[in-house]
């Protein structure tokens, strides 16, 4: 096994391996400093070229490469391609937060975030996360890509109870299974419900008495919103109004965190317009509920979320193409699920610590936009399929896209 990562994470994994695993680690590549020599008797290779030379000359008995750090500034594409060339398995080392047993490391399939053109931006500040400690928290859309990750993140900060709402029975089943696996089901209660069912929502809120609501439930896809405009308006606008009416009614509600989108700025699609309207409705409520806090969090496209281009491209590549791109000139700002969730949680806590204004809007700097066709080409090049074999089809922009 070869480890790739920063010094701290590599050392942490080596210590874990000594006590609880039996991997034979034969070398390290550290990407954050110029440390040479060895760590706990394991050789540090200077760079990828030195590793390539050793592999080429059969001087290493290696079958896998483990990436120990999830927030590296380096593009790891070369390591991935090198691993493929020498038939090595390559995995992310994932730290598992677990209430059942000792914390554990899992080997996960390689993630697209390792190949972004910018480092992952995780915003963590423990002094703000104390905001969630011992609180009752309500999360709408709790089984979706964003909502389910928010549930898992908040569990790290010892809430009193998390209450989750989702319209999908399958989503509720999946999030229940995931939380049970890590041993925190006693901290969570999940309900299948529609946020437009005002009577049921009011009964649940009266029963649960949450102090914080994170409103993530939404129809989020541009094309689906265009084809189902009544559902998009009902969910994104009237569903938000329903949650705000409950927020106004109950005194135990103190903080309303609204998950929005950068498409709400100068909206050109129905989905963007529904979020624009919902944001302004939040602002109207903030003006009359001066003793309560409102937070609006905007972010762009979320990589690897349900229905995003990454899982679509993966499936198309797995089926040997073609990979479909709407327009060769289209670009998008991207962020990762864990980036989006860290922004949401920090923004809510930051706004509470500010007494100057009871409503604020936060937006993460997502770096430079990424051309969708370049992302497709990169994913094809990193796949196990001959890149000359997979075709890219240009399909044209869908209604509402730009």
Enumerate the language-model features and the residues they cover.
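A solvent-exposed beta-alpha-beta segment
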Residues: 1-91, 170-174, 189, 193
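Flexible, Lys/Arg-rich cytosolic regulatory linkers and terminal tails that connect or flank
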Residues: 76-136
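Conserved beta-loop-beta element that borders a ligand/cofactor-binding pocket
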Residues: 252-255, 281-332, 353-361, 390-395
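N-terminal Rossmann NAD(P)H-binding glycine-rich loop of SDR-like oxidoreductase domains
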Residues: 137-155
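Conserved Rossmann-fold NAD(P)-dependent oxidoreductase catalytic core, especially the SDR/UDP-sugar
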Residues: 86, 101-102, 215, 219-279, ...
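NAD(P)-cofactor binding segment of oxidoreductase domains
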Residues: 71-93, 161-168, 207, 212, ...
